[in-house]
């Protein structure tokens, strides 16, 4: 009988566990290892950059820490692991730095009446420890004392299985060190589903001296920024027909008492418990960490009560695979644990932290206030949208439900950046923070941006376009987006998003004006006084003339201003404005004269708008990007009332154009750098397109395209732009532009009439004229400008005969090739070899490879003189170097020993292509090389000798056999 507190021994008590407990241990460890493999197998410098990675790992660790907790018989509920964790202050004070911060929060919170607050603080501590890579260092002292563990856990708990605990810590170390090789040290048989779980055998240190292990936080915490840590914690991309677990913040209401758990199931998986408020301001007040040390989002992330996966699932469903890690699904089978949240205090919404800059729709806050007050189940229908996070909005609760649809973008990790505030009011933490684990059909990301004690903490949905706040203008909404930090794919999607915003705004204005016209017509029909109608008509015409005069100077100023609209853009004329306002009334004119919402706030806020903001550079205002075009267009309507950004409805709903993130490939148990195809894994390729259109691929084209027929070529492209895939009506195909390099038609956004030399025309016709190419082709040709990709001998060998300059360069390259081979074996030619390296290597090593830069330099006459200078320097060295003189040839025909010839002397030397021997051109008159004839005669003589020896051996064998047989007969 071994003492319980004598340290951890491998396999202790494992053989006495029932089959059900071993299966649960296997399932928990398998889920953890699958998640860790998905995090560390991508060679990303930040393991939390993977979409939904931190959320899934938190869920797996919650399942392990909840497994086997002893139930509280007095309160008839399961205790939380916070009591188990917080005693690390006494077991290992050096490792309790992070725990003490959360202990102070729990002790200062006076509103807690049950264990739900402990659960919230424990889950916050778990998220914080995983984010800062210090969870294993904190768990080691706790797991080293088995007697202490038995105070909180049953004998069948996961933490009392030494083999599984060792594997768990190994997985945590792999994440903390971002080293997938540590996973290979775990015995693979540990995860095999057998009747008896084998003992764990690792190739590294075990847990023998755990009680004495200490943890010292590194000093580099203040310098590290963990992008994508909490930002992806509560995100999930909407998927049609799928239900997902999520977390939402109820704005108010007392905590509900939990239901009794059924069987051996953790509380986080069987029920949803709403925690009482936890004061985060107390944490900021008592915590010794600076805002930098707390990183971007330390304690502002909500708690999700459904992290722990169900232990009653079949073992076949235990491994969800890393593909769900990529798309953010907490449960691919769509299980939900419905609960109802009651709200009794709708007035307390001002003290909560719902931000208008979060990725949640405004109606979700309203549903928490209104729908939950009636006791019904709140069903949120918010749809997420990707964007850079905006830091400039005041944290206010928005009410009023608006039905709109927004697109979800492709998976792109965007690090949120700080930006100047657009308002004078700073976001303050004005009340306690209620935590609740709540299930709904769509996840609620709950992005928060808080500022307390001078420190900013950002917890935004990473790469998510936030929803505009109530009444926020389009100019303010578009100007605050950080498009400069977006990836290329995100910028492409932003192009469509901003275009849809402008189109939706214009259509909304038209709709409002048409409705006003109809109302006025109805009023006029009721009004029978003809004199009043004539008077109203005169007033409308007069106001129309005044408005037209006011618009003309504004557009003249725009033509001479910093922002200019391209010729392809549609110009707004006075006739158009007259048509728009022809049926306006006095109220209508007054509405159009109202200033924009942000412009009329105050001078301080207007000075921070897009036009005058110092955060946007001067070159950005002059650029032709989508956001610059949008802002320039909106700037012309500053004096008029524009619809708020929150009032827009997207033209293409989500159900009409469903999009979701592409699943990542299966995780690798080892580092891709060590695999057989490591070079392939390093390439991050995202294949895009559909059955009708695919984006152009980088390809080298050697053939000249035939003269295109626009109607036939566009029909082959399915009337879509070859660059962006936008559909064009057959009546407008004349607006498409032809790319001479790819031989396809592009829209005006993807083809800006850039001109480049076409490689196929250079190689076929020696034509260096510049032709119109698309933006994609231009970028491709610029990238390959210096790459030796064109073999003139294989593509068009007749070009040497047609172009004298090219043939001269070819002869010089032949001489340099022979010289360089000779100088490589001469110890006195090191400086000369360095001068040879000043030109690209293919010019002196491969005779017929050219780049576009080489061909252009040849045509201009610049390449020939450079190569001729190197040739003269090499010939001078050979004349003076005795080592190189010894490598020369003596002509076999004239046998002139005074005239040593070399292969690079093309004017007097002829080199045999077979044996590389050199002769004088005047002496070499016969058709064959004498050295080749000697070598051939020698080979034939050797062949005859080998054949004769083989035949002689074959004839001797029968004679020896007959003599042996005669000797045997004589002996008998």
From Swiss-Prot:
Q: Which residues get modified to Phosphoserine?
A: 197, 248, 266, 388, 410, 528, 562, 671
Task: Map out region (Interaction with CYBA) in residue numbers.
Answer: 567-625
Residues of the region (Interaction with BECN1) are 505-557
> Any idea which GO molecular function terms this record carries?
phosphatidylinositol 3-kinase inhibitor activity; phosphatidylinositol phosphate binding
Question: A single GO CC term, please?
Answer: intracellular membrane-bounded organelle
- Please give the residue ranges the record annotates as the region Interaction with Rab7: 721-972
Could you tell me the superkingdom of the organism this chain comes from?
Answer: Eukaryota
Q: Where is this region: Interaction with YWHAB?
A: 204-447
Result of changing residue 248 to A: Disrupts interaction with YWHAB
Chain intervals for the UniProt region annotation (Disordered): 1-22, 233-279, 307-446, 562-589
Region (Interaction with PIK3C3) location: 49-180
Q: Which InterPro entries match?
A: Autophagy_HostDef_Reg (IPR052428), RH_dom (IPR025258), RUBC_PIKBD (IPR048569), Run_dom (IPR004012), Run_dom_sf (IPR037213)
Q: Region Interaction with CARD9: which residues?
A: 672-760
Output one GO BP term: autophagy
Q: Spans of biased composition, class Polar residues?
A: 378-401, 436-446
Compositional bias segments (type: Basic and acidic residues): 13-22
List the Gene3D superfamilies hit by this protein, alphabetically: 1.20.58.900
Q: For the region Interaction with UVRAG, what residue ranges are annotated?
A: 300-600
All copies of the RUN domain together span 48-189
The keyword Phosphoprotein belongs to this UniProt entry's keyword annotation: yes
Q: Where is the composition biased (Low complexity)?
A: 338-368, 563-581
**Disease per UniProt entry:** Spinocerebellar ataxia, autosomal recessive, 15: A form of spinocerebellar ataxia, a clinically and genetically heterogeneous group of cerebellar disorders. Patients show progressive incoordination of gait and often poor coordination of hands, speech and eye movements, due to degeneration of the cerebellum with variable involvement of the brainstem and spinal cord. SCAR15 patients manifest cerebellar ataxia in early childhood and delayed motor development with delayed walking. Additional features include dysarthria, upper limb involvement, abnormal eye movements, and hyporeflexia.
Oligomer status and interactors: Associates with PI3K (PI3KC3/PI3K-III/class III phosphatidylinositol 3-kinase) complex II (PI3KC3-C2) in which the core composed of the catalytic subunit PIK3C3, the regulatory subunit PIK3R4 and BECN1 is associated with UVRAG; in the complex interacts directly with PI3KC3 and UVRAG. Interacts with Rab7 (RAB7A or RAB7B) (GTP-bound form); Rab7 and UVRAG compete for RUBCN binding; can interact simultaneously with Rab7 and the PI3K complex. Interacts with CYBA and CYBB; indicative for the association with the CYBA:CYBB NADPH oxidase heterodimer.
Described function: Inhibits PIK3C3 activity; under basal conditions negatively regulates PI3K complex II (PI3KC3-C2) function in autophagy. Negatively regulates endosome maturation and degradative endocytic trafficking and impairs autophagosome maturation process. Can sequester UVRAG from association with a class C Vps complex (possibly the HOPS complex) and negatively regulates Rab7 activation.
PANTHER family registered for this protein in UniProt: PHOX (PX) DOMAIN-CONTAINING PROTEIN, RUN DOMAIN BECLIN-1-INTERACTING AND CYSTEINE-RICH DOMAIN-CONTAINING PROTEIN
Q: What is this protein called?
A: Run domain Beclin-1-interacting and cysteine-rich domain-containing protein
Organism source for this protein? Homo sapiens (Human)
